[in-house]
């Protein structure tokens, strides 16, 4: 898998933005990606050094349309901790 296929998008919420002060960033990643693949992709795309990585599989929520029941898609979140000497990831500092 290519690095740009592994990292889907940053997750920008109030909680994730509070963690950026401690050099922790949250991304939505491909559900099939492993921790070593995610670490390599982050280091390759953003040119930083990753010191820690946590992942969480999030189930899809149940949604209804009348009597029909379906689910939203499941996703995997990766919380990346950068080393002290790494630069910040710029997409989180805009706005």
Curated annotation (Swiss-Prot):
Instruction: Establish whether keyword Ribonucleoprotein is in the entry.
Output: yes
The UniProt entry, under InterPro entries, shows:
Nucleotide-bd_a/b_plait_sf, Ribosomal_uL23-like, Ribosomal_uL23/eL15/eS24_sf, Ribosomal_uL23_CS
Residue ranges of the TM segments: none
Recorded GO CC terms = ribonucleoprotein complex; ribosome
What Gene3D superfamilies does UniProt report for this protein, alphabetically?
Answer: 3.30.70.330
Gene Ontology MF annotations: rRNA binding; structural constituent of ribosome
Mention one GO biological process in which this protein takes part, according to its record.
translation
Q: Which UniProt keywords apply?
A: Ribonucleoprotein, Ribosomal protein, RNA-binding, rRNA-binding
UniProt keyword rRNA-binding present: yes
Which purpose does this protein serve, as stated in its record? One of the early assembly proteins it binds 23S rRNA. One of the proteins that surrounds the polypeptide exit tunnel on the outside of the ribosome. Forms the main docking site for trigger factor binding to the ribosome.
User: Which PANTHER family would you find in this protein's record?
Assistant: 60S RIBOSOMAL PROTEIN L23A
Subunit structure and binding partners = Part of the 50S ribosomal subunit. Contacts protein L29, and trigger factor when it is bound to the ribosome.
Which family, according to UniProt? Belongs to the universal ribosomal protein uL23 family.
Query: What is the name listed in the Swiss-Prot or TrEMBL entry for this protein?
Result: Large ribosomal subunit protein uL23
Gene from which the chain derives: rplW
